[in-house]
Amino acid sequence: MLESALKEQLKGIFAGLEANFTFDISVSSSHENKTELLELLGDVADCSDHITCVVNEGDALKFTLLKNGDRTGITFWGIPNGHEFTSLLLAVLNLDGKGKNFPDEAVCNRVKALKGPIHLTTYVSLTCTNCPDVVQALNAMTTLNPAITHEMVDGALYQDEVDALKIQGVPSVFADGKLLHVGRGEFGELLAKLEDQYGIDETKANAEVKEYDVIVAGGGPAGVSAAIYSARK
């Protein structure tokens, strides 16, 4: 399913993996998309000795990421193809500590301080260009805070749920069954909404406070000049 050039790229991307990952697949033997899902995940798993697939009979089409045999809280309902293929790769890399899309330490501490349990579900379209940013942000939060779980759902495969929830646009994020966010969203925006809804554990909210001699606000010519002047001093 994956082209050989892409497989070679994936071998390089996964070369540094240290943990062992499992795509724990649950799929109905009669599901029309079963072969496509198994071929995609099988091709990805072939690119690393640290990734394997386990297939179980189920009544849907989904898989959960396991790390060293333990559940990570990240589940994909559907086939993470198209724009969501990167979301799958980043989920593995983030769980292994190799990801590049984590925010700074202070923001990570805010995620860790969120009170749980929090169960998040994001409905997406594989052609949506705004969906991956939201999926990847929430997967990263799930990696940082064990009290969070996150499911990505391909709305095209679960149209009954989309209709029942009256979803009008994607991505649509639900937190424990309640609509939390619709449309494009940045990491900080999503985190702020979760903080408002669930609160934080003050004992974990220990973001490091740093002291600065000079702070330059703005990125225009004046800001650049001020930064250069300050560095010279």
Where is each model-derived feature located?
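Local sequence-structure signature of Cys/Sec-based thiol-disulfide redox active-site neighborhoods
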Residues: 3-42, 111-152
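Long, folded non-catalytic interaction modules
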Residues: 37, 41, 47-48, 52-72, ...
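Thiol-based oxidoreductase modules, predominantly thioredoxin-like and allied folds used
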Residues: 49-59, 146-160
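Structural micro-motif
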Residues: 57-75, 159-176
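Beta1/beta-strand and adjacent pyrophosphate-binding region of the FAD-binding site
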Residues: 205-222
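Aromatic pocket-lining residues of Rossmann-like dinucleotide-binding sites
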Residues: 230
